[in-house]
Swiss-Prot record:
Stretches that traverse the bilayer: none
Organism for this UniProt entry: Schizosaccharomyces pombe (strain 972 / ATCC 24843) (Fission yeast)
Subunit organization: TFIID is composed of TATA binding protein (TBP) and a number of TBP-associated factors (TAFs) whose MWs range from 25-150 kDa.
Family: Belongs to the WD repeat TAF5 family.
SMART domains: LisH (SM00667), WD40 (SM00320)
GO cellular component: cytosol; SAGA complex; transcription factor TFIID complex
The protein's role, per its UniProt record: TAFs are components of the transcription factor IID (TFIID) complex that are essential for mediating regulation of RNA polymerase transcription. Regulates the genes involved in ubiquitin-dependent proteolysis during the progression of M-phase of mitosis.
Subcellular location(s) of the protein: Nucleus
Protein name: Transcription initiation factor TFIID subunit taf73
């Protein structure tokens, strides 16, 4: 029997080297690369053995750029997951360069790429910037934290295989540096789908699409360094002003005079008929309540964005809002059940891409794949005429001008104008009266996915495939602000009620909130595990709802930046969200053809006997929900297509 050529005292690392040498000599280079990554589970390699593929200083810069550019070019399905690896590679490349006694190259590397990680890891980036020489890596706490603790990342098998394939193909370009850093300092957890208690490698692609449905499996272990505080929490604690926009004294005086006349008219009719027509509070009382609410939040009210002078039509519009609020329903578990007034477009052959209702519930607009926009208006002059008038014919008109499919439409608060955005890269402002284009806005260099008027109608925002959102006003053809920070398509936008902030949802799985006055990010929410498909701000300005392509809905408290509640019911992408005007109900709908009403007083930590947060589930006749909108009177309008 042949004697073994290896002594029993050989260490695990020596055996690993022997296996790697054997694989290299036999030509199994891909297997070699995978082994280098997967042996990371045995623990950190001692410093004296960390000599494999050290690389020249310049190679660190080249290979980091190579990795970053490769990730940017991957499919959107994998990009958000692969981007997680860039930060720990950045940190350890910087520390390596310091330990190589090349502080000049280390500082160049750090300053060149730090901006990519400032938002999510700002605290640690600022701490790492204090390192100047090799001895700092051994002495300063933040460096030792990263060197002695592995950075945890959760990958699916297909994502991991893509990374390994890239590293294998680029070993001649220096990817061995990345392989070494992954092996020594990064703990990649491979999560596989479970099928009857067993792994099923044949469903990997399906699992990528449904990854968020297995959320508990994937995120059961926190990513990053265990026990190290999440830097995003500190970033999201910066002060923001969520108060509502106060009314000028002149406007309040004019409003009160008008409302007193209307209240006296109602009282006179009540006396004549010997009954109460309006049991609700009168309009002056409602205005006083609203003033008090605004005054309570005065310290949180932002400086007013510049707006055109208030006109009489603006005051009339505000009066109509108060009248709607006066007659609004009270919804909830112990109050009135919600109702849905559904408008369905039949036999569209998937031609309807988007829809929007007017603020007064008198008209809606459709954006279509044939590049046209269709307007449907009620001939009824009463309040919210689209509610309860199913047998009434609607007036239809078409707007023609775009050259590619239309993906977003929005109707101004006073329904004078319609905005549309298209794959052709342009946004158009249309006149409702003349049915013609007033302004054509150019700025994006890619398809535009969404557009929305601000609550005051003068400003609007767009979201685009070029990874930016932009702020515009109706009077200028060039953007006022460009919001840059997302790492993938910006898919949806939603204004805060005070118009000082804008929320954006992206295919990079994050939701951001921007200050429209400065163009800077003030909040980042990254709890979704698939592209964000819908957003909605609550009427009080304190909550933001976001939904993703997996059907998961999250509601965020904007003051604390904490997740208020999470809802799981939809089986596919959610296209539309809407808060009731009393901020107690959230309605959602999408491709699974269901309309769901959620109780916002619910909390995730169910107590004994507490019911489900789902108040009602309405099923359609297999029609896709394109848009949902609560009216000012808390009725729900919906538009679907088949």
């Amino acid at each position: 029997m042949a004697q073994s050529s290896y002594s029993s005292g050989n260490s695990t690392s020596d055996l690993n080297k022997i296996v790697l040498d054997y694989l290299f000599k036999k030509g199994y280079s891909r297997t070699e690369a995978m082994l280098r990554l997967e042996i990371s589970s045995v623990g950190a390699i001692p410093e004296e053995q960390q000599d494999w593929h050290i690389g020249a200083s310049e190679t660190y810069v080249q290979v980091y750029i190579l990795l970053r550019d490769w990730i940017d070019g991957t499919l959107d399905l994998y990009k958000p997951k692969l981007q997680k690896v860039l930060y720990p590679i950045f940190v350890h490349s910087y520390l390596d360069l310091l330990q190589k006694n090349d502080p000049e190259m280390a500082i160049y590397f750090f300053e060149s790429f730090r901006i990519e990680h400032e938002v999510l890891h700002g605290y640690d980036i600022r701490a790492l910037a204090q390192l100047k020489i090799a001895s700092d890596v051994e002495e300063i706490e933040i460096a030792q934290l990263y060197r002695k603790n592995k950075y945890r990342i959760n990958f699916t098998r297909s994502t991991f295989d893509l990374l390994v394939q890239f590293l294998f193909e680029n070993e001649v370009n220096g990817s061995g540096i990345i392989i070494r850093l992954l092996n020594q300092y990064i703990d990649i957890k491979i999560t596989m789908p479970q099928v009857e208690g067993k792994e099923d490698p044949n469903v990997q692609a399906v699992y990528e699409m449904d990854e968020a449905k297995n959320e508990q499996t994937i995120i059961s272990e926190q990513e990053g360094i265990p026990g190290h505080s999440e830097q995003l929490l500190d970033y999201n604690k910066q002060s923001i002003q969520l108060g509502l926009r106060p009314l000028s004294e002149e406007v309040v005086t004019t409003l009160k005079n008008l409302l007193e006349v209307k209240d006296k008219d109602v009282e006179g009719r009540n006396e004549a008929l010997n009954k109460i027509l309006h049991p609700a509070k009168n309009l002056v009382e409602l205005l006083t309540e609203k003033e008090n609410l605004i005054n309570e939040s005065t310290l949180e009210s932002p400086s007013d964005p510049p707006l055109p002078p208030t006109k009489m039509k603006d005051i009339d519009y505000f009066v109509s809002l108060l009248e709607s609020e006066q007659n609004s329903l009270i919804l909830g578990k112990n109050a009135t059940d919600p109702s849905v007034f559904m408008y369905t477009m039949h036999n569209t052959l998937s031609a309807v891409n988007c829809a929007a209702f007017s603020d007064d519930a008198s008209m809606f607009a459709l954006g279509c794949a044939d590049s046209s926009i269709h307007l449907y208006s009620s001939t009824n002059n009463g309040p919210q005429p689209l509610v309860g008038s199913q047998n009434e014919p609607l007036q239809k008109s078409s707007l023609i001008g775009h050259t590619r499919p239309v993906f977003g439409v929005s109707i101004s608060p006073q329904k004078e104008f319609i905005l549309s955005c298209s794959e052709d890269g342009f946004t158009r402002l249309w006149s409702k009266d003349t049915k013609s284009t007033i302004v054509k806005y150019a700025g994006h260099n890619a398809p535009i996915w969404d557009v929305q008027f601000s609550p005051f109608g003068y400003y609007f925002a767009t979201a685009s495939h070029d990874q930016t959102a932009r702020l515009w006003d109706v009077e200028h053809a060039a953007p006022l602000r460009v919001f840059v920070g997302h790492q993938n398509d910006v898919d949806c936008v939603s204004f805060h009620p005070n118009a000082a902030y804008l929320a954006t949802g992206s295919s990079d799985h994050t939701t951001r909130m921007w200050d429209v006055r400065t163009g800077g990010t003030v909040r980042v929410f990254n709890a979704h595990h698939s592209p964000v498909s819908a957003l909605c701000m609550s009427a009080d300005g304190l909550s933001l709802a976001s939904a993703d392509e997996s059907g998961i809905i999250k509601v965020w408290d904007l003051r604390s930046s904490n997740q208020h509640v999470s809802f799981v019911k939809h089986s596919s992408i959610v296209y539309s969200l809407s808060f009731s005007y009393d901020n107690k109900i959230l309605v959602s709908g999408g491709a699974d053809t269901d309309v769901n009403f959620w109780d916002l007083t619910y909390r995730n930590n169910l107590s004994d006997g507490e019911q489900s947060p789902l108040l009602f589930n309405f099923k359609t006749k297999n029609t896709i929900i394109q848009n949902l909108s609560f009216t000012r009177r808390n009725y729900c309008l919906a538009l679907s297509s088949s």
